[in-house]
From Swiss-Prot:
GO cellular component: cell outer membrane
Protein name according to UniProt: Hemophilin secretion modulator
UniProt keyword annotation of Transmembrane present: yes
Organism the protein comes from: Acinetobacter baumannii
Alphabetized Pfam families for the sequence: SlipAM, TPR_Slam
Family to which this protein belongs: Belongs to the Slam family.
Signal sequence extent: 1-19
InterPro entries: Slam_C_b-barrel (IPR007655), TPR-like_helical_dom_sf (IPR011990)
Gene name linked to the record: hsmA
Keywords in alphabetical order: Cell outer membrane, Membrane, Signal, Transmembrane, Transmembrane beta strand, Virulence
Residue ranges of the TM segments: 198-208, 253-263, 268-277, 291-301, 305-315, 327-337, 341-351, 365-374, 380-389, 403-413, 418-427, 446-455, 462-472, 486-495
Major location (coarse): membrane
Functional summary from the UniProt entry: Part of a high affinity heme acquisition system. Mediates the secretion of the hemophilin HphA across the outer membrane into the extracellular environment. Plays a supporting role for full virulence.
Length: 496
């Protein structure tokens, strides 16, 4: 019994129960920020008003009067759409539709273009498809429809149409279709291939840790009392408990992240996301640590939203032995508020099955909210809140609730460096009062991570990456759980 309690205390004093949260959050944050930066800017929206007087059409700085007849209005409407003069196009459209026998293919095309300019992509898609039904093989209309499909993340349909357009453009008359259009189409086709390709990163390098065993380097003494022959309380003996000296070590630090989405039809698809990270120390193998987290399931993408629901699996090793396996479920929703702002909600629950320490078996449920804002000059701010409930069979020293705040700032510098600063603050309250500590444990943990990527020194596809992390934990059970830790690593990273 005493040995079991001692092992349990030793185990619970190790930070692996919650210390890798920042690494996992940082890797996910990097993937999500990449998605945000890849989003295309929407067309500028404007208020459309009608007028009885026909505005003059402006082309290449010259103004042309438009007469009130169907021929003039049809030409002016088409040219206004192609010149992206949306207010004028709307006026021409209104007047043109008053004439009997107007060209429905033209008006549907114009209405689709105006709808696209306002961000109404579903309506734009319907109008372009209607126009093509009346006038099949209209290359300009096909091109606009393909763009709308691309912007709505309907990757499979967009790719099919763009490839067809590519073939037509190669055989078209440059006098009718400018050669620059083919260049644009080629660029979008490449973007579609990248969007549906495997993306991620892998990095490895050396790391130095100043307090590998997360020791407080403190001790505490208790006085045990008993009663004498007369029944009075007297001190019997003193018991001192303490933590070992902090150990430093040099080892291998490695990380990998991977995402892949398979478009099935329309907005629907299947997505995979996998993370792997850990550290290995030659002279301190008992502190080796690694984690693999995989989730794959249903994915919905459109212009403004990305939704995913999937099962997940996580495997963690500690000291070269399997620590636990976990199965669970994950749901996420990322909303692109505008071209420079995004918001994400995540929730997951996993059933932890420890291979040796069965009293730690339980369910961990968590929820995260994150906001991104891109500023001029390639500054990006992100921040978030998180809550977590970690329940275990052992209710006194391992089960807890946690609330956290995250703040971060990243910047791409013109000198060929990228920097990211991430800080997290967590408040952890354990479930019950523990007689062992004569306290109900509560911790305040803070982590500060600074990452410098050096693309200017890239060679053979490898980018140098320097990461510094400071971890501070303050506990009311100070002698056992309070500690400071510094970690610095230098890795080579390959992104694909």
């Amino acid at each position: 019994m005493k040995r079991t309690l001692l092992c349990c205390l030793t185990l619970l004093s190790c930070p692996f129960l919650y210390a890798d949260e920042d690494t996992q959050l940082r890797l996910n944050q990097s993937l999500d920020q990449t998605l945000l930066q890849e989003q295309r800017q929407f067309h500028e929206q404007g208020t459309i008003r009608s007028t009885e007087q026909l505005p003059k059409l402006q082309i290449n700085g010259q103004e042309y009067s438009v007469e009130q007849n169907p021929n003039d209005l049809a030409k002016a409407l088409y040219l206004a759409v192609m010149q992206k003069q949306w207010l004028k196009a709307t006026v021409y459209l209104e007047h043109y539709k008053k004439y009997v026998g107007y060209d429905r293919a033209l008006t549907d095309f114009a209405e689709g273009a105006v709808a696209r300019s306002q961000g109404q992509l579903k309506l734009a898609e319907q109008k372009f498809q209607s126009s093509l039904k009346q006038q099949p093989h209209n290359l300009i209309c096909e091109l606009e429809l393909a763009r709308v499909l691309f912007e709505q993340q309907k990757n499979k349909e967009a790719a099919r149409l763009f490839i067809s357009i590519q073939d037509q453009l190669k055989q078209s008359d440059p006098a009718v279709i400018p050669s620059g259009v083919l260049t644009t189409v080629n660029t979008i086709v490449q973007a579609l291939k990248k969007r549906d390709s495997w993306q991620g990163s892998v990095s490895a390098g050396y790391t130095y840790v100043s307090n590998l065993n997360s020791s407080s380097e403190q001790s505490k003494t208790w006085t045990l009392y008993g009663r004498d022959s007369e029944g009075n309380m007297i001190p019997v003996r003193e018991v001192t408990r303490g933590t070992p000296k902090a150990e430093s070590a040099i080892g291998l630090d490695y990380e990998a992240s991977l995402i892949k989405r398979y478009a099935i039809e329309g907005h629907h698809g299947v997505a995979l996301r996998a993370l792997a990270f850990g550290q290995s120390y030659n002279d301190h193998a008992t502190f080796n640590e690694s984690t693999i987290n995989i989730n794959a399931g249903y994915s919905y993408f459109d212009l403004k939203n990305q939704i995913g629901v999937s099962p997940l699996f996580e495997h963690k090793r500690y000291g070269n032995d399997g620590l636990y396996n976990a199965w669970g479920a994950r749901a996420e929703w990322m909303h692109f508020i505008s071209a420079d702002k995004a918001f994400k909600l995540e929730a997951e629950s996993k059933d932890l099955n420890y291979q040796k320490y069965k009293t730690l078996d339980g369910v961990e449920s968590s929820a995260f909210a994150t906001f991104w804002k891109i500023f001029p000059d390639q500054w990006t701010f992100f921040g978030g809140l998180d809550v977590l409930d970690h329940s275990t069979q052992e209710k006194y020293m391992a089960a807890y609730q946690q609330q956290g705040v995250r703040l971060g700032l990243s910047k791409s510098w013109s000198t060929g460096f990228n920097t990211t600063l991430l800080s997290s603050y967590r408040w952890r309250l354990f479930d019950k009062y523990a007689e062992t500590f004569l306290a109900r444990r509560h911790d305040f943990e803070q982590n500060h991570t600074f990452v410098v990527q050096m693309p200017r020194f890239e060679f053979y596809g490898m980018t140098p990456n320097l990461t510094y992390r400071y971890n501070h934990n303050k506990s009311n059970v100070d002698w056992l759980y309070s500690y400071d830790k510094h970690n610095i690593s230098f890795k080579l990273e390959h992104r694909f």
